[in-house]
Amino acid sequence: MKKILVRAPFLTQSGYGEHGRFVLRALRAYEEFFDIYALPINWGNTGWLWEDTAEREWFDQIISKTVVYNNAKPAYDISVQVTIPNEWQKLAPINVGVTAGIEVTKVAHQWIEKSLLMDRIVTPSQFAADIYQNTKCSVKSNETGEINNDFKTPVPFHVVHYPYKSDVKEEKVNLSLEYDFNFLTVAQWGPRKNINNLVTWFVEEFIDQEVGLVCKLQVHKNCYMDRGVAHAQLKGLLAKYPDRKCKVYLLHGHLKDEEMLSLYKNDKIKAFLTTTHGEGFGLPIFDAVCNDMPVIAPDWSGHLDFLYMPTKSKKGKTKNKAMYAKIDYTLAPVPKEVVWDGVLIAESQWCEPQQGSFKIKMREVKKDYSRFKSDAKKLGKYIRETFSADKKYKEMAEVLAGESLEKIDLTDIPKISIITSVFNGDDHIEHFMEDIVNQTIFKEKCELILINANSPGNEEEIINKYIEKYPDNIVYKRLEKDPGIYSVWNMAVDMATGEYLTNANLDDRHAPWAYEKQAAALLRSPGSDLVYADMLITEQPNETWSANSSNGKQYNFPDFSYDNLKMVNMPHAAPMWRKSMHDKYGKFNEKYGSAGDWE
């Protein structure tokens, strides 16, 4: 299992924030391969998320775990840095840079220099990768003094697109839209998004018509003051057209994915507009496509990866076809006011959408809406399948790991025997039983062998309740006297019918997927006989994996070696092992009072 550190603005309301969350979701989907750590960072002036969700709870657990680990001597196998390349560092033996690239024709030479710190680079679009890879700069050889004016980064690039979020359920946002035909735009109001022209050209085209434009905008943060700034800017644009018939609506503030979905599915919102100067990917455009909404956009930059789809011609040849309304454009130098030293350079160009073409496309979409809607439905179906979360999470996880990752089919996991000694466990037995039966593969793959070592407690009453519920999964035996814990374990080994064994103490608690992941690790590693895990350290008894007082405090056991085993019993925390080991090495040594599992 690789220790992997993600440094990203994953708690911010930003494109890079969503990119960071995508990386973490992909790693979580393949959690059996990774020990995940995460450091949240700021992203400009954007706000931070405050949603109280299960995912946010998981983020907080990972952050706490990272803080505790970093107070020791952290040693990560891989770092993943989701940010602009200027901030990339060597943080681990393997370093992966994840960036949206730059939405112009060249990257800064600093990016080429920083790329050399990375072992591989991930971008969300082919456009972003091509611009980065094809930019040349001048370098001087330290050995010969020779200058190479055509130096390009030699670091390998991987394109991993954002996934379609099929699990998002719509939550209605109440909009009072006066007209039945409305366009939608979603953006942070900055120079690159070209909002001033979009609004102005829309009003000029539909000044005397019953058409609306919904603008989901923020300038920096989704706060009340920011709303005032956005409202003033929009009001200033519209002041030139006091007698217009068309409507322009400002929608401001943070909307959850579920609420954003309701915009794309609103019966009165018909198409998505963008006059962007360039996109690394274009998430709002992508969301529109995923929900069968016709798109009007310039024919340049990252969003083209999902606005074209392969189609067969009458002659049977397959070619990529534009499934949206294309705006004509020219490439022009970026304005001086947007130049950003080390990031957005003066020698670069970006897309200038043509006013006339934009107006024509809006007119065409409104007039011939059924044709554009038909194309949008075809494209949406294709993108939902091609960009599914399962596919994209696998692509991302494999790129980050640097190797193929194959999940184990649960049907291939052999039977697991859980061996437990019961003694003086009244305070723990109910919570213990609930913890075990809630394992993801308990009913299908597990048998729980409970041996009561003549305990003076009343554990049997609780155990019998669970035997009634799970008669095929629980084996119970009561002894007349206590022979010692390792004698009990050896009895359980003899009784076990599973190919894999694990011990579970009454005061232990497990992640609900613990046995599934341990068994999968054994199945995936035929040369290994035992797997073990790290442990959270809690302050209170009977806490659960999802709600406990560990605050990230944990034991991080080292990789197995005989030298390390002399120092600490690394596999002590509920290991899982092959039953066949007992045929080769015998059973637990009953002479030891507390170290039989170490010996």
Regions found by a protein language model. Give the residues of each.
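Glycine-rich, basic loop-to-helix element that forms the pyrophosphate-binding segment
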Residues: M260, L479-A496
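A recurrent flexible, glycine/aromatic-enriched loop bordering the glycosyltransferase active site
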Residues: Q349, Y555-M576
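Short, acidic, metal-binding catalytic loop of nucleotide-sugar glycosyltransferases
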Residues: E434-K445
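Conserved donor NDP-sugar-binding/catalytic core segment of glycosyltransferases
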Residues: W513-S546
